Amino acid sequence: KSNGMVSEGHAYFSQQLNFETPIRTENGTEISMIKMTVKSRVLLXGTVALIYPSPESIDFQGLFVKLFLSKPSPPVLSLNETTDAGQFSLNDTNEDPFAPLSRSRRAVSNSXNANASLVSEILERIGPVCLFFDRQFQLYSLNVNSVNLTLSASVSVQIDGPHTSRIDVSLVLSVGQNLTSVVIQKFVRMVSLQELSDVNLNFPPIFRFLRGSTSFLESNTDVRGRLVVLARFRLSLPLQNNSVDPPRLNLKIEPYAVIVVRRLIVAMSVBXIQQXVXARXVVXXSGPKVTLSFNDDQLCVTVSDRVIGPDVPVTFFRRLRVCRRIPRVGRLWVRTRRGWRLRRIFTFSRRCFWVIISGFRGRLSPTVTQEGFVRVCNITKAANPSILLPTPTSQIAQSISTAQMVSSTSASIFATPVLALQSSSLRISPASTAPTSATVSSPVASIS
């Protein structure tokens, strides 16, 4: 048990029993002792699956062994869990002694391949495969008095064999050029992931004050406000969609964040006249949702998102800085010929304050960018002779530039290719030791 939760548990012990009277078998052999060995496998289910699991030692107490001798078939030993913690019973059944135990806790359902729980084992079974994906995109943008409030996301997937596999997901909120706040920044090492149904991580709320100022020529811009962020992170690795034989992989990562900027005030001052805008922006971002899957001899990564950004109520007003001299009356003891006398002293102080000269209320419409369904796949050595991979046409020029193939009219992809090109249709012949050719055809560019 680990915190009262057990995903699977099997005992291991070795015991030798010596008989006082030897047992004679049918072929005339005498048996004076019997040695029993039961192997075990224990999978601990925890609440955090983003760290390396630490090995745990298990002590068995109250373990009773019962030996059954029957003529029709040799004895078959199996382990069944009892209701009492730490006690096991050994019964005569026809079940496999190392079959996984069924559990109903945490909605975990075991399959025939439940013992192969690491994603690295699935990647080893897939074979030599590489997949690299790196993308940054802007989800939300709002211009408040020439200051941009933007929400950006980045996804990075690096898979180079079973032991070098990592997924990075981050959400960053920027106010202007100097104020940056990280909303979510998580990385998942797939070599440490166990087969779990769902893992939900609720981050503590983030409360932060935003203060900054910039100056350009004779104008000064001040930004101040309060940032509130509620974020959570979900990792889904269901048992029924992952197996080692046949190799199947389905991993989903879904970050979610609600960002509230309370009373964001952007004030621009020029020659004692200030134009200020007070806004209350609310952004609900679901994504970027990352899905890593292996089906039909293809290892693919899919990225999508959904952002909700309603209109922002704002208040525009102009105010004038007015300074006045305010007299003050004080008393001071002064020494004269007749002695100490109390005199009145008049002093003047300078006070400045803002006077609103105009103002009105309205709404600002933000720019919400919905990232489309982006899918990038790689082909292993066991791939079909010809596989068609559709991708968005609008990203052809950017992807070809990323692959550094624009300056040349011919390109080749070697064995175990890393798919860096995206086009309306991309056809790759099977990988081999010799260079493989790739042909890209689209309305934007054409190389062969």
Swiss-Prot record:
It comes from the Eukaryota. This is Uncharacterized skeletal organic matrix protein 1. Keywords: Secreted. It is found in: Secreted. One of its GO terms (cellular component) is extracellular region. Component of the acid-insoluble and acid-soluble organic matrix of the aragonitic skeleton (at protein level).
